[in-house]
Amino acid sequence: MKKPLEVFSEWALNGKDKGMEKNHANPVEEMLNFITKERNEIGNEFSFLDLGCGNGWVVRKMLKEKLCNKAVGIDGSINMITNAKAFNDNCKYIVGDLEEIELQKKFDVIHSMEVLYYIDEPADLLEKIAKSWLAENGRLIVGIDRYFENQESHSWDNDVGTKMHLKSEHEWVEMFKAAGFKQVSSWRANVNDSWAGTLVISAN
């Protein structure tokens, strides 16, 4: 099997990053609406970090929010970051391994869509986010399409040819709690007759 980074680098070269943007648009929109509503109620400017940002579409979207004063995206694929930087906007992009990179500043909002189950040790990454990356009174929000209750996702590792974790909704939520987050909630976004929905986990 290929490493996830190899897969995503290939996708960036053949244009599949645009397909990811299209396929993830609805659940991400729901997640971002949740974030912006909360930040508008708080009323202060906020910084935003997207983990596994791909071509940067979520980063660009968030920077348009009036209270967002900084938007940063991190991705392990140089090709993805090259695609992101091609837009020549005011967003900042970093090439880096999420499990190894160390950040100098904390962020008020941290978002990630369809990344966590590709990580070798997702529990360690969540602990690092809780202890070192998320600012006080900040918000982490994560979207996961591959989880045990979503039967359609069970074959994805073989379909794509890369390693992926498969955990239940309960196991994911408990992992967030064990990482040190005080409040953890979950729901499914973009549910319809043919799709179990994106598992969304929010924590602070």
Question: What residues fall within each predicted segment?
Answer:
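Conserved class I S-adenosyl-L-methionine
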Residues: M1-N40, F148-E149
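Class I SAM-dependent methyltransferase SAM/SAH-binding core
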Residues: L49-L51, N55-E100
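A conserved beta-strand element that flanks and buttresses the S-adenosyl-L-methionine
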Residues: H111
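A short glycine-rich, Lys/Arg-flanked "PGG" loop and its adjoining helix->strand segment in the class I
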Residues: A123-E136
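Conserved beta-strand signature within the Rossmann-like core of class I S-adenosyl-L-methionine
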Residues: N137-D145
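Short, glycine-/aromatic-enriched active-site segment of Class I SAM-dependent methyltransferases
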Residues: D145-K163
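Short alpha-helix
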Residues: M164-A179
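Conserved S-adenosyl-L-methionine
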Residues: F181-N192
